């Protein structure tokens, strides 16, 4: 397999980033979008070629897909036998991720040509978008754990730049800082985790590390199991800390607080973050080290399972109460990522036991299609209505037929309605959960009903309910827009009111709509499994009945409550006031963090530290200065400035030296 071809996949977006970053403001001020889109087109085509070549030509040997390191270069050398390499690794999950990242990013690039048209920093936006894509592509191709950490951090920097793109909005600046800081804490855990694992495995290379930490006769595994703190092995600590990094990036509870605020960035950025880059990076990380989790440390994998299930349910409940269209989708992402995580948690290794692993990756693949479609559809609605609030919408199906149809397809897909893509991947996840842990299966089943409810609550509120034009022709009517993204983007200055979105925005919606339908028919188990062997999972009608039933019940309840004007939602929220208020306020997790930060860290740590710094550290420094000052004052009396005095002291010194010399003799 040609290393140059593989290397070009991330290098094309990197070239776009450098070109637009250095010369975009003046030279490519208007053509930056075309340059960025062409670079991603090249990367997407090369990714498809690579996927075909790997899956059907060179990747399988004796019925097993191999890990192929197509490029390996020595980067840093610290001494004989001690070095850090960089390389490009191809295996089923990295190749699958190449296709997902480049395809979704290409759709976002094309969509942004219309959505961001006229933006003052148009080329800079595409520069940041290219950097984001390069970072994620570098991450999924990384051949060793140190290399993945470098690109992991670069993904964080890219998200910081894009979330804070509207830097003149204080809320956007605050959101970008919040995302950066929260994920930094998680990334610290990730760094410590990879140091522990690489120290005991005595390597940074993924293949060697996994082999050594899963071989029962390996001295490295023995070292990792016997070492540790507080009765927990070093291997468990390492994997849990690595998962902490993944939980931060993937917005798992309780490290999810940055995700809703990240909606302050442009809507196409939200599509990329939620569908194909930042939030799926954590799932990819756990999948990359899955053999170690499953074979050597099932306790850590159980933590992944419970955190994923809790996050899925927690986010789904919150999404049922939110009124901002993008925040509903944000919590929807958190819930679906939770599905992927607990699917990994319930999975075994190899054969039918590895169904959860395949189902998780399958859901990552299908979710990328319909979640990108949902966010881009939301962007088209915001572009038309000039608001993020569901209360400012309604009846848009007549005015936005393409957006309406594609959004409906995406809602049906995420609700798990057959025969759309989400149905097949969710069915596999629920099957794996049913055979592994009945409690997790019950949580997943209930969450699937909530998912259908809140997505169709969103759908009916936007496209049905009251007529949009009856109450909303005047932009001055909008006095309570929370997000203000529409007010910042030039596209929101009336361009949308003439009709539906331009073709550059509709084309990605239509393509993603098709993918949301057909992606579920891919025989995913033939290509991606926990051990590289084909997994032929059979469809069981009995397993599909329950989730489909729960989904249809959720849709029916949303239909009764939100298809037309009704006081039923108000009555339900009043009857469930405590739960509703808790969910609407996101169960006060942000307030808990503020309390911990201000009351505990600031008062119990910050204030005492400040007192010690002021009175002890500065006191010692000031005391030293005062001693020097007093000493100089005392000694200054000897500095009379008279030559006679200096001559006398010189003579005294000479005599003292002579006397000392005589005594030494």
Please give the residue ranges for each predicted region.
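Transmembrane helix-loop-helix hairpins at membrane boundaries of multipass inner-membrane proteins
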Residues: 1-7, 22-127, 201-230, 288-290, ...
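Membrane-entry segments of alpha-helical transmembrane domains in multi-pass membrane proteins
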Residues: 1-11, 27-34, 82-100, 138-151, ...
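Alpha-helical transmembrane segments and their helix-start/interface "positive-inside/aromatic belt" motifs
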Residues: 29-42, 177-189, 398-406, 500-513, ...
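Aromatic-capped, Gly/Pro-kinked transmembrane alpha-helices
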Residues: 79-89, 525-542, 561-665
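Hydrophobic transmembrane alpha-helices and their helix-loop junctions in integral membrane proteins
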Residues: 107-148, 157-488
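Alpha-helical transmembrane segments and their membrane-interface junctions
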Residues: 413-424, 428, 513-531, 597, ...
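Glycine-biased, low-complexity coil/linker segments
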Residues: 493-496
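Hard-cation-handling environments
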Residues: 502-555
């Amino acid at each position: 397999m040609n290393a140059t071809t593989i290397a070009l996949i991330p290098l094309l977006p990197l070239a776009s980033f450098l070109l637009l970053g250095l010369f975009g403001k003046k030279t490519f001020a208007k053509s930056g979008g075309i340059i960025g889109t062409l670079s991603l087109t090249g990367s997407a085509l090369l990714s498809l070629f690579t996927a075909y070549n790997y899956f059907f030509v060179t990747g399988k040997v004796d019925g097993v897909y191999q890990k192929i390191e197509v490029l390996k270069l020595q980067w840093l050398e610290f001494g004989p036998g001690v070095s850090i390499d960089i390389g490009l690794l191809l295996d089923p999950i990295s190749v699958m991720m190449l296709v997902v990242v480049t395809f979704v990013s290409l759709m976002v690039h094309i969509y942004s040509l219309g959505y961001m048209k006229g933006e003052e920093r148009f080329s800079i936006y595409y520069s940041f978008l290219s950097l984001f894509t390069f970072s994620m592509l570098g991450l999924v191709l990384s051949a060793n754990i140190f290399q993945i950490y470098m690109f992991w951090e670069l993904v964080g920097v890219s998200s910081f730049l894009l979330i804070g793109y509207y830097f003149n909005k204080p809320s956007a600046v605050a959101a970008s800082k919040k995302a950066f800081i929260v994920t930094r804490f998680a990334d610290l855990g990730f760094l410590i985790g990879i140091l522990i694992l690489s120290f005991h495995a005595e390597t940074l290379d993924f293949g060697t590390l996994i082999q050594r930490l899963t071989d029962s006769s390996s001295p490295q595994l023995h070292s990792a199991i016997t070492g540790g703190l507080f009765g927990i092995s070093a291997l468990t600590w390492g994997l849990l800390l690595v998962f902490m990094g993944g939980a931060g990036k993937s917005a798992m509870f309780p490290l999810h607080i940055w995700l809703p605020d990240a909606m302050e960035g442009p809507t196409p950025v939200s599509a990329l973050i939620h569908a194909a880059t930042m939030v799926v990076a954590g799932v990819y990380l756990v999948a990359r080290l899955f053999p170690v989790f499953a074979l050597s440390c099932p306790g850590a994998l159980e933590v992944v399972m419970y955190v994923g299930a809790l996050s899925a349910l927690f986010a789904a409940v919150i999404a049922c109460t939110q009124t901002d269209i993008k925040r509903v989708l944000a919590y929807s992402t958190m819930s679906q990522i939770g599905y992927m995580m607990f699917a990994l948690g319930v999975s075994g290794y190899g054969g039918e036991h590895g169904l959860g692993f395949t189902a998780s990756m399958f859901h990552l693949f299908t979710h990328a299609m319909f979640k990108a479609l949902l966010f881009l559809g939301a962007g088209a609605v915001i572009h038309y209505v000039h608001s993020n609030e569901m209360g400012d919408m309604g009846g848009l199906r007549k005015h936005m037929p393409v957006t309406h149809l594609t959004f409906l397809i995406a809602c049906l897909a995420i609700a798990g309605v057959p025969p759309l893509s989400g149905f097949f991947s969710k069915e596999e996840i629920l099957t794996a959960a049913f055979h592994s842990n009945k409690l997790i299966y019950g949580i997943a089943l209930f969450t699937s009903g909530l998912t259908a409810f809140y997505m169709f609550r969103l759908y009916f509120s936007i496209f049905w309910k009251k007529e949009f034009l009856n109450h909303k022709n005047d932009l001055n009517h909008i006095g309570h827009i929370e997000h203000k993204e529409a007010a910042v983007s030039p596209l929101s200055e009336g361009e949308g009111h003439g009709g539906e979105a331009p073709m550059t925005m509709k084309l990605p919606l239509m393509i993603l709509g098709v993918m949301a339908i057909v992606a579920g028919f891919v025989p995913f188990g033939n290509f991606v499994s926990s051990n590289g062997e084909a997994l032929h999972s059979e469809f069981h009608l009995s397993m599909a009945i329950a989730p489909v039933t729960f989904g249809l019940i959720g849709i029916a309840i949303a239909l009764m409550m939100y298809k037309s004007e009704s006081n039923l939602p108000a009555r339900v929220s009043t009857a469930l006031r405590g739960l509703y208020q808790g969910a609407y306020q996101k169960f006060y997790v942000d307030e808990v963090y503020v309390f911990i930060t201000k009351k505990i860290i600031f008062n119990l740590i910050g204030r005492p530290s400040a007192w010690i710094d002021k009175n002890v550290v500065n006191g010692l420094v000031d005391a030293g200065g005062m001693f020097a000052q007093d000493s100089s004052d005392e000694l200054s009396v000897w500095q009379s400035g008279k030559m006679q005095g200096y001559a006398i002291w010189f003579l005294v010194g000479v005599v003292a030296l002579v006397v000392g010399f005589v005594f030494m003799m």
